[in-house]
């Protein structure tokens, strides 16, 4: 579910072209573009589209589509549920675009009505209340095997305690605090490299863990956001030493890798991911040695 605003410049000639970096700077936003796993690639844009977020209160991201800017047409949207701060940011972005374009009309696709910038600002409390109700309904839905939200920087799988708490919450304070806290960390959010065998067509997921870098890894090799429903049959991990510009010998079975991490102060990140503390070269070499003694290793 989303709130989508179509913005059209009214003047017939000399359409104003807005660029993503300038809009981000004017509103105090950061921006990037999602990869295939809904992990944000910072400071990138694709075909005039990007995801905006405010670094001081990171939510689910505001999608901007300026692919038809030469026609004086733009679209911005936010996902529901989202945080009150992000709704405020959305209204600010709409106001900035309206100001840059001069005379413009704004139309909400979902509500099938026009809005002015002032109406958006005045409606923030109502929009936030609807978002909170949507969060309640989302968390109360027992048909979901898991509750996953795409956030501004990466996906988030709700833990059982958050699902329970947000199913009956009366405000968005903890929701906003949690989403920002998860995304404000300076971490590497692991993404797999998917390879398919020519003979069996089986798909393998390959991950890389680097030294001295706090990292978020899925508990299972297939634990990435997979809207294409690809069937991953096996997973492997490789250790990379950036300081020496080389990888340690071997690729190790993913399940064994996760089991061996139990002694390294690993913590839960969300229901499907763990937070691995920065590991030194010596620790990676030692871990590789343990895994090298197990079965199923493949040579790199």
Go through each PLM region and give its residues.
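Short, extreme N-terminal segment that most often corresponds to the first beta-strand
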Residues: 1-45, 140-164, 292-300
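Secondary-structure junction/capping motif
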Residues: 16-22, 116, 243, 253
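Short, intrinsically disordered low-complexity segments
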Residues: 22-80, 84, 225-233, 238, ...
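Charged/polar, solvent-exposed surface patches and flexible loops
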Residues: 25, 92, 96, 286
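Internal, hydrophobic cores of structured domains that mediate oligomerization or house catalytic pockets
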Residues: 35-36, 41-43, 65-168
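Aromatic/basic-lined ligand-recognition segments
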Residues: 120-239
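Extended, charged low-complexity segments
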Residues: 230-300
